[in-house]
Amino acid sequence: MKKTENILASSVDTDALVSPDTIIDAQSGSLVDLKSSEPIRPFKVKFDDAELIDLRQRILATRWPKRETVNDATQGVQLTTIQKLAKYWANDYDWRKVEAKLNSYPNFVTKIDGLDIHFIHVRSKHANALPIIITHGWPGSVIEQLKIVEPLTDPTAHGGIIEEAFHVVIPSLPGFGFSEQPSEGGWEPNRIARAWITLMKRLGYNRYVAQGGDWGDAVTELMGVMAPSELQAIHTNLPATVPDEILGALWTHQPAPATLSPDEKKAWDQIDFFFKKGLAYAQQMGSRPQTLYGIEDSPIGLAAWILDHDARSYELIARTFDDKKEGLSKDDILDNITLYWLTKTAISSARLYWENKVVFFKQLGVKIPVAVSAFPDEIYQAPKSWAEKAYPKLIHYNRLEVGGHFAAWEQHRLFTKEMRAAFRSIR
């Protein structure tokens, strides 16, 4: 992968949300923190043809197992599903389309805490737009957020109003995508949260909000716990709201308390299902990530591992290859998988589970304003009662009818509406 310095950001105007200690670099268009000695360097996504040829040859050379002995996905990704994916990937898929899409936005890298961090930074043309940093999870990437960049930065062209505009910052997690892979331990969600605070300070934003789901939620909520004065509020689509007594009962396989409301019982059942049927991927990556050499060496191995994220998300991801109605296209799915392959980040991204010290879904004690969008096909749909206890300053809660783990990706129009509503009260 070659790094070049010929990508130009759109011209922008300074506004009240930008620190006086920053300037706009004439070459890159990015904000530069005058107090920081670390430069913000333009970045271009570019892979050689030889890498794409090698990918195709590896797909075609796959050694296939016999089909599963059941007629469903209870044993894992079904052979017919992954073979349909392989056929499309090898014969019809075009990486250059998403590469061009990525390069249509200003991309940058900057060194934070010894690591080169990649991020997309798109500033709105509208004055007083609200800066937002949006963090992906696993098995996601910055590709998850591409569909919401233009609606957020240019709301008047996408059914919104000027007052709903955002300046958008989308970083790649360390060891993911185009960010540098850590060569030593210690890059866990707390450290990443501190790095994101540094990034927003380096970009010169003295007032901003943050959003995340999956690992992005952990990072975003920890930013909320750290509560730098610049961070006004956060939004999450996979909130950490489960009360300690409920979480303890679920971990120890106790029966559901009789006092749960219908919404709480639904959440209980979803988490119980996830702990019993959907946690294997996280347990493997959390205990022995380096053992997963197969997903680093085989594109089909990587694709199957990503498809089988968890049983509930598997339905959302894999159904496009099973000729079912879907919100994600075949290209959507393969854009993301191919990014993992070309950047060689299958194992480096898995190590985040090994590094992690945050308990899944456990309340973290965020005291700043929080907005929650609860999607029905998420790992669990957080009840409002739990959200109110977890977040004393809950400024927005909406229980959606459609959408799941990849909400911004699969339901980008609905997700955009949620972003506009979530932060309306703090602008």
State where each predicted segment sits:
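Non-catalytic accessory segments flanking enzyme active sites
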Residues: E51-R123, N128, D332, W341, ...
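Glycine-rich "HGGG/HGxG" loop immediately N-terminal to the catalytic nucleophile
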Residues: W95-K97, G160, L173-W187, E221
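Short beta-strand element of the alpha/beta-hydrolase
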Residues: A129-G137
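The serine-hydrolase catalytic nucleophile loop
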Residues: W138-E150
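Conserved hydrolase catalytic core segment
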Residues: P151, P155-A157, Y205-A256
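Conserved alpha/beta-hydrolase
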Residues: L152-F178
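Conserved acidic catalytic loop of the alpha/beta-hydrolase fold
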Residues: N190-Y208
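C-terminal subdomain of alpha/beta-hydrolase-fold enzymes, centered on the catalytic histidine
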Residues: Q283-R427
